[in-house]
Amino acid sequence: MKHTLTLLSLGIALTIMAQNKKTDIAKTQLVEHLSVLAHDSLEGRETGTIGLEKAARYLVAHYKKIGLKPFAANGSYRQWYKLPYAEDGMTTDKASNIIGMIEGESKPEEFVVISAHYDHIGKTATDVYNGADDDGSGTAALLAIASHLMEEKKQGRGLSRSVVFIAFSGEEKGLWGSEFFSDHPTFSLKKTTADINIDMIGRIDTERNKADTMNYVYVVGNNKLSSDLHPLLDETNAMGHQLVLDYKFDSPFDLERIYYRSDHYNFARKGVPVLFFYDGMLLGDYHQLTDEIEKITWELYKKRVDFITDLLKNFANRTNMLKRDIPLND
């Protein structure tokens, strides 16, 4: 009996150690996915075009390969919506958000969302805007994180809450996809503890000019909607990441109004606590032909993805959902 208890105690200890160990996402996965998403053949992934549809099919294929659970009754990962208006170059009047889930072990009816947008701004007659950072980097990370968490689940280290992976379309047009989703959610937003949104995490802010340039990430939203957000960020960082978490865009004097400019905002307006991870690349290559995969800072990109994955795990495994105790105050 004593021998059995010793083995049981050892097993519990090893499980706790595994859960507290810093995540190590395979860089090769990030490279593989981003090489496809930022390729000329996807024609800049503009909403309403065949390029976006090619990207959507790639995402659906990998959701299936990973084994994510679809929400639609017909087994589809797609949430279709009609485009608010047509623009020159569009070949269809609809687009889709790509939604899949890893079901939670003990609280499957509660959710953590991780989101990115897979659209970009398209092409001209002669050039393609590949959007490697914006937001190929977030979309590639979404797939790599999903693969990692599914593998952990198969090894008996599943998370308590369900994790929902959403690749939004229409972000560049005005947050179309996430607005439609938040008005027509496929699961309860009241039971959603948080949205972690990743939009541009593969580059550096060329205006930063600080010694920590290769070890930072901008975090937006830590002082809004929930007082639990900041402590959980610090707790996750102490797991061995030691990233510089820069909150400059949470200033009420932020002239760029970054908090309102990506898909997380459509969760926030519904009362869901959000965090937005961002590299700050506002100048230089932002929405330019030069936003190419060759300029991705791979080691820093991977550091950020590892941190975001561990934060997601902490959100999913904590005893209670995040408090909703701070008004948004638009």
Which residue stretches match the model-derived regions?
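Bacterial Sec-dependent N-terminal signal peptides
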Residues: 1-21
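Second-shell loop/turn segments in exported
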Residues: 20-24, 40-50, 86-88, 126-135, ...
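N-terminal capping segment at the start of a domain
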Residues: 25-54, 66-72, 279, 285-288
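Acidic/His- and Gly-rich active-site-bordering loop/insert found
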Residues: 37, 83-122
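A non-catalytic alpha/beta surface segment that caps or lines the substrate-entry region
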Residues: 45-102
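Alpha-helical metal-binding/catalytic segments enriched in His/Glu/Asp
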Residues: 98-100, 114-174, 308
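Metal-dependent peptidase/peptidase-like ectodomains
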Residues: 168-270, 274, 323
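His/Asp/Glu-rich mid-to-C-terminal helical/loop segments that flank catalytic regions of hydrolases
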Residues: 279-330
